[in-house]
Amino acid sequence: EEAWLAMRDEGEIHDLLLDECLHGISGTDSKPGIMKNGVVKAGVTPLQHKLLHCVGTVAKEANLPIFCHHDPKVQSGYDILNVYASAGVEPNRVILGHTGDCNDWAYQEDLVKAGAYIGFDRLAYGHLDNPVKNSVKNIVELVSKGYINRIFLSHDWATYLAFWDSWDKTVSQDYLNLDIDFTYIS
């Protein structure tokens, strides 16, 4: 929970984000092509609700899609979509990231049936939360049901990092070593 955001009301955050979407980020002419949120393992807390609603409102006004990180093990995707809907955002404008981290095929199907996109976006280290073979099985099942256009396959940038090791190992890795192919799914 971010103190800077907790201290500000939704209107103030909204105005800052909308200005950056319409006029440029931090005084530049660079504008976002997508909005982004994240929901913690605790699910949609009061602060998360405020931020989801705010980002949803800005995304609607600026005509931007939304990517939202979430923890599918607590099934917060339902609440996330409901908050976005209360801000006027249709589910087909939302990607729920990390949905493939769980092996709950019914949950994944519910989200795509609702119209959202889902991310199987951490496949390279799926062994930590959900074995890759389970994710592949769920992807095949979803594709066989006609949801191929609702699934984002990737592996999060974190797959390049030694997240599960020490910081020293992380910063000492050579990410520009072209002899290492980080684009595999095992």
Label the model's feature ranges.
Residues E1-K60, Y117, A124:
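Active-site gating/metal-coordination segments in enzymes
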Residues P46-K50, K73-A87, W105-K113:
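Distinct, well-ordered alpha-helical segments
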Residues H49-C54, V132-I139, K169-S172:
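Charged helix-capping and loop-helix junction motifs
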Residues A62-P65, A85-N92, V112-G119, Y147-N149:
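Glycine-enriched alpha-helix->loop->beta-strand junction motifs that scaffold or abut catalytic
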Residues P65-P72, R93-G100:
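Catalytic beta/alpha-barrel core
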Residues L96-C102, D121-E141:
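Active-site glycine- and acidic-residue-rich loops that bind
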Residues D121-R122, I148-T170:
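Short acidic/histidine-rich active-site segments
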Residues L176-S186:
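Mid-to-C-terminal alpha-helical segments outside catalytic/metal-binding sites
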